[in-house]
């Protein structure tokens, strides 16, 4: 009987430890939002550079990898480059922005989902999904975007 009690206690202790480890490794999610203001053509014709405000405040850029379009629709395949004010980097998956022309050279962002797949510092192991709205002015090279979404930090940190 004493052996069975010891085994039961050992199994219970192992379960408690596993639950504690799992809880420590769980992600803590918080909302994120702000604005991006960039200039297209800052480096070359396909690259923007600018600033991010809000929860992910810092410097931001994007490279247009390719485009496709039919009628008034212009689709941009984009790779983002982002460094927060504290020096952490954000690693985003390539994104697709679907826009529609609202005036000559002026495009409204219809859908623009972006997926965070990690980064450095507090963003190491973080994930998140962000949606964007805004405008691209190909006449002046100005891009303005409003972003909103959720960031889930690894280990419950943020």
Task: Mark where each language-model region is.
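Beta-strand-enriched cores of mature, soluble protein domains
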Residues: 25-158
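Bacterial N-terminal signal peptides
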Residues: 10-20
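Glycine-centered signal
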Residues: 3, 19-23
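Bacterial N-terminal signal peptides that target proteins for export
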Residues: 2-11
């Amino acid at each position: 009987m004493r052996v069975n009690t010891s085994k039961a206690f050992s199994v219970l202790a192992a379960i408690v430890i596993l639950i504690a480890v799992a809880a420590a490794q769980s992600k803590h999610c918080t909302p994120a939002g702000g604005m991006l203001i960039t200039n297209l053509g800052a480096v070359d014709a396909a690259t923007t550079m600018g600033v991010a405000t809000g929860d992910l405040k810092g410097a931001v850029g994007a490279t247009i990898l390719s485009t496709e379009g039919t009628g008034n629709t212009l689709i941009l395949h984009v790779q983002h480059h982002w460094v927060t004010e504290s020096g952490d980097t954000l690693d985003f998956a390539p994104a697709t922005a679907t826009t529609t022309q609202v005036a000559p050279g002026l495009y409204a962002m219809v859908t623009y989902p972006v997926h965070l797949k990690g980064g450095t510092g507090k963003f190491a192991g973080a994930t998140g999904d962000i949606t964007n709205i805004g405008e691209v002015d190909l006449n002046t090279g100005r891009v303005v975007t409003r972003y909103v979404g959720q960031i889930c930090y690894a280990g419950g940190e943020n």
